[in-house]
Amino acid sequence: MAKKSKNLRAALEKIDSTKLYSVEEAVALAKKTNFAKFDASVEVAYNLNIDVRKADQQIRGAMVLPNGTGKTSRVLVFARGAKAEEAKAAGADFVGEDDLVAKINGGWLDFDVVIATPDMMAVVGRLGRVLGPRNLMPNPKTGTVTMDVAKAVEESKGGKITYRADKAGIVQALIGKVSFDADKLVENFKAFHDVMAKAKPATAKGTYMTSVSITTTQGVGIKVDPNSL
């Protein structure tokens, strides 16, 4: 713990908490101040001036990052018949029906993404209390309720991320790993920023993005100038 605190203090000394860094500066600083002993994740956070209690100001969706996430996702698909075979051929890790429901209700959660064909949602709905709080419930807005299961599996395996504004209007997203080249992290960051900018609700008032920051696992938040994106 003492060593971690020392590393954290050292990282804080390199960051000016009053400054808005350009995206290039922020990415370089995030990599430089990372002290985790593993290939840490790089995440961004957007504090949005929205009221998620209003249906027209809820922000949720999915996108495929141009350079992937550096993470291998374990994909579970609820499908039957030909669609189940398509999912398997596309590389899904787990494919099934009621058998998977029983397994998940028994406490098994060794997967990162859940995809379902529309006809399977009545079955998947029984898992709402388990999948919902973990943001794993299939949803048409994130492309995880679809008949094109092959495409959904391939995208999930190839760098697709989902995002959702929480009750405070904060959206967090993974944009890569510390081991990524800085230019690839910058490209992913800019791609996600474009999505966030386009997601601005028409009814949102005032400054839409009140703050944007980047951090690594166990790292320090670095404020980013939205205009540099």
From Swiss-Prot:
Cellular component aspect of the GO annotation: large ribosomal subunit
InterPro entries tied to this protein: Ribosom_uL1_bac-type, Ribosomal_uL1, Ribosomal_uL1-like, Ribosomal_uL1/biogenesis, Ribosomal_uL1_3-a/b-sand, Ribosomal_uL1_CS
Pfam families per record: Ribosomal_L1
Keyword RNA-binding among record annotations: yes
Keywords linked to the UniProt accession: Repressor, Ribonucleoprotein, Ribosomal protein, RNA-binding, rRNA-binding, Translation regulation, tRNA-binding
UniProt keyword tRNA-binding, yes or no: yes
GO biological process, one term: regulation of translation
Recorded GO MF terms: rRNA binding; structural constituent of ribosome; tRNA binding
Database matches in HAMAP family: Ribosomal_uL1_B (MF_01318_B)
Subunit structure as annotated in this protein's UniProt entry: Part of the 50S ribosomal subunit.
Functional note: Binds directly to 23S rRNA. The L1 stalk is quite mobile in the ribosome, and is involved in E site tRNA release.
Family: Belongs to the universal ribosomal protein uL1 family.
Identification of the protein by name: Large ribosomal subunit protein uL1
Species of origin: Streptococcus suis (strain 98HAH33)
Lineage, uppermost ranks: Bacteria, Bacillati, Bacillota, Bacilli, Lactobacillales
Gene: rplA
